[in-house]
Curated annotation (Swiss-Prot):
Family: Belongs to the major facilitator superfamily. TCR/Tet family.
Keyword terms: Cell membrane, Membrane, Transmembrane, Transmembrane helix, Transport
Entries under InterPro entries matching the protein: MFS, MFS_dom, MFS_trans_sf, Sugar_transporter_CS
Pfam families per UniProt: MFS_1
Protein name in the entry: Efflux pump aunC
Gene that this polypeptide is encoded by: aunc
Superkingdom to which the source organism belongs: Eukaryota
Amino acid sequence: MFAPSYDAVLSYTSIGGVQCPRLCYKLVLVTVGLCFCIFCTSLDNTIVATAVPRITQQFHSLDDVGWYASAYLLTTCAVTLPFGRLYTFFPIKWVYLSALFVFELGSFICGITPSSLGLILGRAVAGLGGGGLFSGSLLIITQCVPLRRRPAFSGFIMSIFAVASVIAPLMGGAFTDHISWRWCFYINLPFGLVSAVVIFFTFQTTKPVVQASLREKAAGLDPLGTATFLPAIVCLLLATQWGGAQYPWGDGRIIALFTLFGVLLACFVGLQLWARERATLPPRLLRGRNIWGSALYGFCLNGAMFTFVYYLPIWFQAVQGTSATESGIRNLPLVISNVIFAIISGVLVSATGYFGPFMLLSAAMASIAAGLLSMLHPSSGAGEWIGYQVLLGSSIGMGFQLPVFVVQTTLASTDIPTATALMTFIQLLGGAIFVSVAQNVFRNQLAADIRAALPMLDPKAVINAGPTSLRAMYSGETLTTLVAMYNDAVVHTFYLAIGLAAASFLAATVIQWRPSPKSISHPDSS
C-alpha cells in the first residue's frame, strides 16, 4: 500500500482518523471504485429477470424460478442491519473488502454452477456480501469527504443504484440472447476486482469508529438480536414473495410465516430494549423525528420507485408491443433524469445544509408523476411516457439519497454506521415488500379481467406466458382485449405507487426545516 503526500499540492482534512484531501485524484479513484461496486451489486437485484426463461430451459427447473431472485434478496436484506454493527466495531476498509469478496464468490458460483441448486446457493452467498456493500460505500464517503461535500458525492453514488436497477433487465436480456446467461454473473467479477484494487490502495483507515475490547465487540454485535432478526426478515420476505403467487394468502404456510415473523419481531424488539447501547439498533436512534421520519420516507419512496422499475417495462412490452431490449431503451428518460437530479440535489443540499424542503419537493413531484403515469393507455404517445418518466426520474433522483444524508449530518460519528445501515435496510425492504404487493395487485387484476371478459381463456396460462409472448399467442379482437387488460392491470400497480408517494410526502412533513448544525460549524469544509 502506498500513501503519497498531498501537502505540496493540496490541503487536506482529517475525518474519522483518516487523512483525506478535499479534492484530488485519490478521492476521484475512490468514488469510481465505489460506483463500480454499487453498480454490480445493484445489477443483481433485477438482472436475472430476463435470464430466467433460458436458465429454466437449461436446468429444467421451472419450480425454482422464484428462488433465483428471492435468494439474493433474502440474504441481502437480512444482513444489512447487522453489517452496521460490524462497521461500528471493526475497520471499515476490511469489513468492506470482506463483504466484496463474499459477493464476488457468490457471483463466481452462479456463473460456473452446473445445477439449479448451485445457482440458488450462489445467489444467497452473493446476497450475504451485497448486504454490506451499499451502506459500506456510503460510510467510506463519510470517511473521505468533508461534511458539506458529502451529499454531492453520496448523491452521485446512490444514483448508480437506481440506474443499475433500471438497466439490469436490459443487460440481462442482451447477455442471454447474444452470449450466455452466465455473463449476468460473470460481469460482476471485473467490476468487483477494479473496486477491490482501488479501495485497497487508495482508501486508508486507521481505527474503528468505536474503540472496544474483543469482549465488548462480541457483546456489541448483539448475537441474540441478530439470531432473532435474521429469521424474522426471512419469514417476512418469504411470506410476501409466496403469498398470492405460489400459495393463496390463506394457505397454512403463509399464515405460519407471518406468525413466525410477528413472534420473532417481538423478541427482537424486546432484546433491543434490554440491550440498549449494545443492541443491533439502539432504541435511542429512533427517538428523533428526523430519523424515524426519514426511515418511513425512504421505505415508501423506494417502494414506489421499484414498482415503476418492474412494471413500466411490462407496460411497454405488453401494451405497446416492444421487445425486452426496446423497453429498456424506452426507460432511458427515467434513468437519465434520475442521475441528473441526484447530482443536482446533492449539490443543493451541500450548498444550503437543508434536506427537509427537498424531501417534500421530491415526494410531491413523485406523487404527481405517479398520477400521470397511471393515466397511460394503449394509444399513449411518446410525448406522454417520456415526459412522465422524466418527472418521475427527477423526483426519485432528488429524494432517494436524502434519508442517508439526514443520519450522516444529524448523528454523532459513532452512530453513523448503524444509522446508515438502518436507512439502507429500510429502503431495500420497502422495495422488496412493495414489488411483491404490486405483483399480487397485477396478477389478481389481470386474472379478474380475463375471467370477466374472456372466460374461454385460462388466466394462469396468459399470465405465465409473459408480456412478450402476447402477440405471438393471440390475434384480432382477443389480442386487443388482452392488451387493454394488461394496461388496466399495470395501471392498478401504479395506483399503489401513488399511495406510496403520498405517504412519503406525509413522512417528509415530519422532517425539521433547519440546516445541519455540523454543516454550519465546519467552515473549513465549505
